[in-house]
């Protein structure tokens, strides 16, 4: 999860002019809730946490899943949005909805896990995934052609009173392992160098016995 990406989602999708940590945490809470929903509620295709590792991590060192959540819309916009299974599935493959700033169109997917909640039937999910497969912009590595793990939980997304997100009948959280996440590392490396050059926060580590 990349704070910069989540700030942008809050501004663009939710119309929050100056998002704070409360806004970011509320959005992240929806993601965590969706990932663990199948452990807590019934569904036709339940997925446990061990399956994430099995399906998303082809090699131990390639273990950096990219998170996407849809729909992220405010109550004002929800009136005009249909949010069908197909629409929220397609939204997960849009760079603007990802919680790390990178462009999957520049890389290839190794594995994808789609976790649906609410008013969702397996037939619609299969149709949405089949449509995604036909898109040329979404490419999978040659050695992992199937690439999709699906989860369906019947419990609808929980609406938080006075929260930022609108109440919706269905939602999807996507965890994917894509080579494009490599774009995030040089940016993170640069930010670290800037902070370390000013010795920001270094005193906390020195206080715990580490050398500067």
Curated annotation (Swiss-Prot):
It comes from the Eukaryota. It holds the Pfam family Tubulin_C. Keywords: Cytoplasm, Cytoskeleton, GTP-binding, Hydrolase, Microtubule, Nucleotide-binding. GO terms for biological process: microtubule-based process. The active site is at residue 51. Coiled coil: none annotated. InterPro entries: Alpha_tubulin, Tub_FtsZ_C, Tubulin, Tubulin/FtsZ-like_C, Tubulin/FtsZ_2-layer-sand-dom, Tubulin/FtsZ_GTPase_sf, Tubulin_C. It catalyses: GTP + H2O = GDP + phosphate + H(+). GTP binds at residues 3, 25. Its cofactor is Mg(2+). It is found in: Cytoplasm, Cytoskeleton. GO terms for molecular function: GTP binding; hydrolase activity; structural constituent of cytoskeleton. Dimer of alpha and beta chains. A typical microtubule is a hollow water-filled tube with an outer diameter of 25 nm and an inner diameter of 15 nM. Alpha-beta heterodimers associate head-to-tail to form protofilaments running lengthwise along the microtubule wall with the beta-tubulin subunit facing the microtubule plus end conferring a structural polarity. Microtubules usually have 13 protofilaments but different protofilament numbers can be found in some organisms and specialized cells. Belongs to the tubulin family. Tubulin is the major constituent of microtubules, a cylinder consisting of laterally associated linear protofilaments composed of alpha- and beta-tubulin heterodimers. Microtubules grow by the addition of GTP-tubulin dimers to the microtubule end, where a stabilizing cap forms. Below the cap, tubulin dimers are in GDP-bound state, owing to GTPase activity of alpha-tubulin. This is Tubulin alpha chain. It comes from Pneumocystis carinii. The lineage of its organism: Eukaryota, Fungi, Dikarya, Ascomycota, Taphrinomycotina.
